[in-house]
């Protein structure tokens, strides 16, 4: 029954029942974690063959001695595999070390210090400051980069086919201080939304007041399907070039959630001008990436189909966990109508919206009973969710029994926070004080 249809007395009685359920959670002495989208040990085990590669044969197919310096672009064979997966030409893709987030950080830093290919000056010299558009809910570590660098962040609502492009077009057309936008175009974090072709076309084609506006295209979940189908990649570089804005997209990806989260390979894609620009400055801090690690990945995968087959093994582990979360949330929260949640077809997260004004309270209640959940508001710039309703759930790391207990407990906390808030708002002013 919807909470809206309850009398004050019924709401008070329901609140008392949720208090009893919460007290039972307190007695369980839980220690459960839903915070980060980390691969489980079972998933990491899928890649253990990497630990014995490349063995004594340290040369790649081109004859490069991977043990030595050099090779800033990365190994051609591995670049070819991920160029196919990402829909990018090989010359437009370079392979780096383990962290695509590091690439993003460096490119923002390089832009601040030196300016980009189309920049009239270094961003740090812009008198009116720098602004970034941030689709919300979004990736907290993206927002941490721009916040650390003193870049103003503007939230953009996320729709079913991507961010609100009407609003984006309106903003970028008149404000030259808007230099970039964070994007996760496939199976977004945490929304699960995949940008439509039309959304991508408009983003690369739109007129911007800043000549050096950039799309930070974080394709972190390009092959991370929860079904048996892989998403079709939109050729963002090709569309941008056709629109006359070849330098607009910076494309990022990595194997962090494909092989070893701390020992994978990152990728940066862009126009040939952007590739040369990046390497010009990256070459000052490193003489080349870890090519031995790239070689082991090349041999482990073999080709793009090898990556796809590997990801279907991940899918077999992850899909039941995501289905379990949806099942528990449906059982516990559907009738009350105080929450909604995504059921993504890929990626690593579920976005849960609870009763507005109760997300922080829900997370605090969960923490007090030993259920760790990502901080409420983390998916928004400056950690400020204006509606205080969004909670990110990461199902990948816990075991299935722990995941069930954690989500069930989180649902109890959401229900308790909702009845508590409704009573305190005076929507049931005649209800007894049961707090």
From Swiss-Prot:
Keywords: Aminotransferase, Pyridoxal phosphate, Transferase. Its EC number is 2.6.1.1. Substrate binds at residues 139-141, 392. Its cofactor is pyridoxal 5'-phosphate. InterPro entries: AspAT_Ic, PyrdxlP-dep_Trfase, PyrdxlP-dep_Trfase_major, PyrdxlP-dep_Trfase_small. The keyword Transferase applies. GO terms for cellular component: extracellular region. It is an enzyme of class 2 (transferase). It catalyses: L-aspartate + 2-oxoglutarate = oxaloacetate + L-glutamate. One of its GO terms (molecular function) is L-aspartate:2-oxoglutarate aminotransferase activity. Pyridoxal 5'-phosphate binds at residues 69, 100-101, 189, 221, 254-256. Gene3D superfamilies: Aspartate Aminotransferase, domain 1, Type I PLP-dependent aspartate aminotransferase-like (Major domain). It comes from the Bacteria. The keyword Transferase applies. Disruption phenotype: Deletion of the gene leads to virulence attenuation in macrophages and mice. Main aspartate aminotransferase that couples nitrogen assimilation to aspartate synthesis. Has a weak, but significant, side activity toward kynurenine (Kyn). Oxaloacetate and 2-oxoglutarate, but not pyruvate, serve as amino acceptors, while Asp, Glu and Kyn serve as the best amino donors. Essential for axenic growth and survival of M.tuberculosis in macrophages and in mice. Belongs to the class-I pyridoxal-phosphate-dependent aminotransferase family. This is Aspartate aminotransferase. It comes from Mycobacterium tuberculosis (strain ATCC 25618 / H37Rv).
């Amino acid at each position: 029954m919807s909470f809206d249809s309850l009398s004050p007395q019924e709401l008070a009685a329901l609140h008392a029942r949720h208090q009893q359920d919460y007290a039972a959670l307190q007695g369980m002495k839980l220690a459960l974690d839903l915070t980060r989208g980390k691969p489980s040990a079972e998933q990491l085990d899928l890649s253990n063959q990497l630990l014995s590669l490349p063995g004594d044969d340290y040369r790649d197919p081109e004859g490069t001695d991977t043990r030595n310096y050099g090779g800033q672009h990365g190994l051609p064979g591995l670049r070819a595999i991920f160029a196919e997966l990402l829909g990018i030409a090989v010359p437009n893709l370079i392979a780096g070390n383990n962290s695509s987030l590091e690439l993003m950080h460096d490119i923002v830093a390089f832009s601040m210090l030196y300016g980009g290919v189309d920049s009239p000056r270094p961003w740090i010299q812009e008198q009116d400051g720098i602004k970034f558009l941030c689709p919300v809910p979004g990736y907290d570590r993206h927002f941490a980069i721009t916040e650390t660098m003193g870049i103003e962040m503007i939230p953009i609502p996320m729709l079913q086919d991507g961010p609100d492009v009407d609003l984006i077009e309106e903003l970028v057309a008149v404000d030259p201080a808007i230099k970039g936008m964070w994007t996760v175009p496939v199976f977004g974090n945490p929304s699960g939304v995949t940008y439509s072709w039309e959304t991508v076309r408009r983003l690369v084609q739109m007129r911007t007041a800043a000549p050096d506006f950039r799309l930070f295209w974080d394709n972190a979940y390009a092959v991370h399907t929860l079904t048996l189908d892989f998403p079709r990649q939109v050729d963002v570089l090709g569309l941008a070039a056709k629109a006359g804005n070849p330098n607009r997209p910076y494309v990022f990806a990595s194997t962090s959630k494909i092989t070893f989260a701390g020992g994978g390979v990152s990728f940066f894609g862009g126009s040939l001008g952007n590739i040369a620009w990046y390497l010009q400055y990256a070459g000052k801090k490193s003489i080349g990436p870890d090519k031995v690690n790239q070689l082991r990945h090349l041999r482990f995968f073999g080709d793009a189909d090898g990556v796809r087959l590997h990801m279907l093994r991940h899918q077999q582990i992850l899909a039941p966990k995501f289905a379990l979360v949806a099942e528990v949330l449906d059982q516990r929260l559907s009738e009350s109508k105080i929450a909604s949640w995504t059921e993504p077809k890929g990626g690593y997260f579920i976005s849960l919206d609870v009763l507005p004004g109760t997300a922080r309270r829900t997370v605090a209640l969960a923490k007090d009973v030993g259920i760790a959940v990502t901080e409420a508001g983390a998916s928004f710039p400056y950690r400020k969710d204006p509606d205080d309703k969004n909670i990110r759930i990461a199902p990948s790391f816990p075991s299935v029994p722990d995941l069930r207990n954690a989500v069930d407990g989180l649902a109890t906390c959401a229900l308790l926070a909702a009845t508590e808030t409704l009573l305190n708002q005076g929507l049931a002013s005649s209800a007894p004080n049961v707090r």
